[in-house]
């Protein structure tokens, strides 16, 4: 997993609340068994049926910092929703509230989910409306987002923050213990099952 310390990208104002995982990526796209190729499914119902949807505009189609309304990622637990956001190019999503499971899935995959006050979300929406294509800089170490002269703090679970800054997914966490695993396996009797030949 790629380390996350700072990221600068175009902010995308998703001025909708209660965006559930079925809206993020409909179930029809969940048939793949790989973790890539989901960008076409991201918000597909809105992108296909609303020509004015934010991701259909030239200004925001390459955005990488999503500023969403409250209760983002609710509904069923779909890692595919996180994968779709990341495949599209998003590195961070900010909202005043996230579903716990979505937030956990995001942290494990490398997508930052930062919690801001709703008034700060609305301030960012206003700034992006005034300056379409506004670049936002996310500093995970300091837990701030900078938009021009405006600096806004955000919250993130300390454990997820550490994992993102270290670039550690579940496999990476396990590999940190590789010496201990190999030592344990070397001491196991030969008649017991082994993980290596």
UniProtKB/Swiss-Prot annotation:
GO terms for cellular component: 3-isopropylmalate dehydratase complex. One of its GO terms (molecular function) is 3-isopropylmalate dehydratase activity. Keywords: Amino-acid biosynthesis, Branched-chain amino acid biosynthesis, Leucine biosynthesis, Lyase. Pathway: Amino-acid biosynthesis; L-leucine biosynthesis; L-leucine from 3-methyl-2-oxobutanoate: step 2/4. One of its GO terms (biological process) is L-leucine biosynthetic process. InterPro entries: 3-IsopropMal_deHydase_ssu (IPR004431), Aconitase/3IPM_dehydase_swvl (IPR015928), AconitaseA/IPMdHydase_ssu_swvl (IPR000573), IPMI_Swivel (IPR033940), LeuD (IPR050075). The keyword Amino-acid biosynthesis applies. It is an enzyme of class 4 (lyase). CDD domains: IPMI_Swivel. This is 3-isopropylmalate dehydratase small subunit.
